[in-house]
Amino acid sequence: MSEEVDESVRRADRWSRVIGLFVALGVYFGALQLTGDIAISMLAAAVTAIGARIYVPYHASLRVAEGRGTNLAEIPMTGGYHYGAVGLALIVGPLVTVAVRMVETESILTLGAGGLAAAVTFVVVRAVLPQ
């Protein structure tokens, strides 16, 4: 990260690795218990961990006071997408996938429902959360 990024965002970025690991473990074992499907559990765990890894620094950047640093949206190297919306969409989508898998055995329908939930979450959250 750039020198202009607040230390709290840097700290959150470092901690997001650990948080992502524990989120992955929790989602994997929880989904495995609920569905009994190893593939869906692995997919849900990986994608949810990535979502947590993206969302945690975004959340920390929202708390950066004016003048103390630059938030993620203002740093040219971070890209032009909405970190909060992407992170939350990557968390909600897999959780919906697991929920649908509990009642539906067709994996294409299950993955489609999760993908649709992620897309809807992204669009809604992008409009609600600050950049």
Model-predicted segments: where are they?
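Haloarchaeal acidic low-complexity proteome signature biased toward cell-envelope/secretome components but also
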Residues: 1-25, 61-81, 127-131
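Membrane-helix boundary elements
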Residues: 19-50
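Hydrophobic, membrane-inserted alpha-helices
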Residues: 22-29, 90-98
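Hydrophobic alpha-helical transmembrane segments
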Residues: 38-43, 107-113
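Generic alpha-helical transmembrane segments
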Residues: 40-62, 117-121
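Transmembrane alpha-helical segments of multi-pass membrane proteins
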Residues: 48, 73-90
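Membrane-helix boundary connector in multi-pass membrane proteins
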Residues: 91-112
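Alpha-helical transmembrane segments and their immediate juxtamembrane interface regions
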Residues: 113-131
